[in-house]
Amino acid sequence: MSLVFDEYGNPFIVIRDQQAKERLRGIEAHRSHILAAKTISNIMKSSLGPKGMDKMMVSQDGEVLVTNDGATILENMQVDNQIAKLMVQLSKSQDDEIGDGTTGVVVLAGSLLEQAEQLIEKGIHPCRIYEGYETACKIATEHLKTISDSIEFSKDNIEPLIKTAMTCLGSKIVNRFHRQMSEIAVKAVISVADLERKDVNLENIKLEGKEGGKLEDTQLVKGIIIDKGISHPQMPKIIKDAKICLLTCPFEPPKPKTKNSIEITKAEDFKVLGEIEQKYFTDMVEKVKATGANLVICQWGFDDEANHLLLQNNLPAVRWVGGLDLEKIAMATGGRIVARFEDVSADKLGRAGLVREVGFGTTQDRYLSIEDCPNTNAVTIFVRGGNKMIVEEAKRSIHDALCVTRNLIRDNRVIYGGGSSEISCGLKISAMADDIASIEQYAVRAFADALDAIPLALAENSGLPSIESLSTVKAMQIKEKNPRLGIDCNHRDTNDMKAQHVFDTLPGKTQQFLLANQVVKMILKIDDIIKMGPGADE
């Protein structure tokens, strides 16, 4: 325990270090949290690149998840160590900001900490290490700008965007159809993008999936798809020139907010009550029909009596539609959501050229497709696959491609993949380290060595001799002064990533370096770990 003495010489306890707490200090603390971070990094390393392996996650209730997405893997891992949780948050930050590169940022952070551990063992203070890392990171991010290229695209020329999205999908489960999936993702983003303002709202793109069919059956719908069907089997399944009434209020008589009861003593009274309720339903249906609506979409359900009245009045309806779906339908059709039935009017109706119910094979599954909407800024990517697991992974993959395309519209600069940018930055940092006279030179060189972890992992995952491949590409970059040379993961007999059309976005790679460096700095500044134990509050 830690004791201090007051002005009278009496001792008192500041921190009780016995059974109540577990404590690590100094170099032991650094070793502990560097080991935790390296463990997470090593788990993720085999998932990096186009030949990266998938991970199977099995939850406590037996639900199986197979994925290659770094953020998803870490999100579903049961991590108890607090430093390991920082690595999970690191991947999530990359996913939230960029949408791609979630595996690479964790591998890079683990490599930086591994190099830092070697410097700490040599007696270099962690403060000097992360100061050197800051210097090296600044050199790397500036060098990325010098080796980047700008790509030109327009609504009529989306091929450069498609090729960049294909790089993102190369390691995913959809890689056999990555050309088709990239085209779908790019066309979806272009549909909702304002190219003049370089603004993209991905919330206007809905990702919907249904198991059954093949991955290549995935399609882009210029409209909204909802996982619901028409409420009655005898109602029309195809509505042309649809005028849609959107309701968030229940399609039923209002219920009093206070406690009440009705006493019925005669059969005639019960009959009158039923007639009043039926009249209320009839008035509601007539009020909707009077607006000119020929389709009702309701957030809440309605009973069979209301459903039968709707059928009699030839008014198709859809019930139990989620609030978010209702908002997207309103945005696409130009309609306004009605919260009180008294407010139903013709000017609040949404419009669509075609609304149709589509079924799947021999199953009872159905979905509603709302197409030819006035607002073309709302689209749906409808994903198909052999089972739910494939559909969900395909949706995650397409989401990454959407994010990459959005980033390119915001900033059209790209750097080349295959580890070429890391190798080029490593060479630049090593050259600049010669001009640093202080002890930080060791940390700067360590940063350059840490960058080699990315091309080494790419080569190893592709079945290539990792060290030999890295050495060869480094020598070629120095000899030819060509920063586009990287690891030939796809075995195409050329190391020129421009010729292979392997691209990364400049903002994505820059963010990787900055986030990894920030987390490493945070971890290196921790020199004392205090864990509360049982009985600590006694």
Swiss-Prot record:
InterPro entries: Chap_CCT_epsi, Chaperone_TCP-1, Chaperonin_TCP-1_CS, Cpn60/GroEL/TCP-1, GroEL-like_apical_dom_sf, GROEL-like_equatorial_sf, TCP-1-like_intermed_sf, TCP-1_chaperonin. It is found in: Cytoplasm. SUPFAM superfamilies: GroEL apical domain-like, GroEL equatorial domain-like, GroEL-intermediate domain like. Keywords: ATP-binding, Chaperone, Cytoplasm, Nucleotide-binding. Pfam families: Cpn60_TCP1. Belongs to the TCP-1 chaperonin family. Molecular chaperone; assists the folding of proteins upon ATP hydrolysis. Known to play a role, in vitro, in the folding of actin and tubulin. This is T-complex protein 1 subunit epsilon.
